[in-house]
Amino acid sequence: MSKPPSDPPRRAPAAFIYEDEATERRDNGRQGGERRKPESFSEHIVVTPDEDDPFLNPDKDLSAVPVAAPRKRRTSFGKIAAGAFGILLSLAIGLWTDSLIRDLFTRADWLGYAALAVLAVGILAVLALVIRETSGMMRLATVQTIKAEADAAMLETRPVKARAVVARLTALLSANPETAKGRATLKATEGEVIDPPHLMALAERELLAPLDRKARALIVNASKRVSIVTAVSPRAVVDLLYVLYEAVRLIRAMAELYGSRPGTLGMFRLLRDVLAHLAVTGSIAVGDSLVQQVLGHGLASKLSARLGEGVINGLMTARIGIAAMDLCRPLAFRALKRPGIGDFIGDLTPSMSPRGNNP
């Protein structure tokens, strides 16, 4: 019976030092010459705080859109000149109207009385227009006043000012049927003792949460329409005109949702504030953060160039909607999460989301 072949002896483990030619030359140079003196490097060193470190906080939204705020109204020489020439033009129109009516009376009395009747109708229409525009401007100012009073009431120890702010907020949103449940909940807590921060948080959740959901739907729908029109339109000027149309429509819908209901002048002021905020923050242009968001979701390799432009224009429309939401919302975001630009990418490109392991 033959013996099984024995295993060959195994080599014992050993350690080897690997040095390349550059390391050998550097070591030989140091051995032959003087060694470098130890030094400390304390200049041009930037220490990143832990809360701002993206590697320690990967869930932090680094591309958050800045909060929009109304512009401060300042008196300028242009406004003074416009007011002076406006008064002069009004006087000229008044003198021309007076001369016209006098000439009509000299020709026939009934022509003069007809001109007076037409003038009275025109004056009444102008007064109604002025009242409507003034009311719209006052509603916009009321929203900003409630927001400022809410910030001040948060610092109080007694809930008196907070109750007053909640009452004004309830009156502002009383015409909206979606706030009926929230108004009933707040009315049931009138006899309870609640500190101001918790009371303002309760008012925000009960009154503004359903409106925020509707506002998000408005932004998503407007962004989708802009994305589709940009993808199929033959000219760039069509894209620009449609983006402006959707932006104005979205801002007006956002103002009406939160109880502002601005007139024509109020709409121009609100549109100017939104565009000024976007111009200052650089959000109206396709910046590095927007490109990073698009590329980070893998759209560059999955979309055509034209469809990619549509997605970018849709994200720009979403930023306009977020800025309008900040301006029209009567309370700042505290108890509820403020929407970010990344919240709308999945809605604009639902087919780009991962589907798991299914083939």
Curated annotation (Swiss-Prot):
Belongs to the UPF0283 family. InterPro entries: DUF697, UPF0283. Its main location: membrane. This is UPF0283 membrane protein RL2646. Residues 1-48 are annotated as: Disordered. The chain crosses the membrane at residues 77-97, 111-131. It is found in: Cell inner membrane. One of its GO terms (cellular component) is plasma membrane. It is a multi-pass membrane protein. It holds the Pfam family DUF697. PANTHER family: UPF0283 MEMBRANE PROTEIN YCJF. Residues 23-42 have a biased composition (Basic and acidic residues). The keyword Cell membrane applies. HAMAP family: UPF0283. Keywords: Cell inner membrane, Cell membrane, Membrane, Transmembrane, Transmembrane helix.
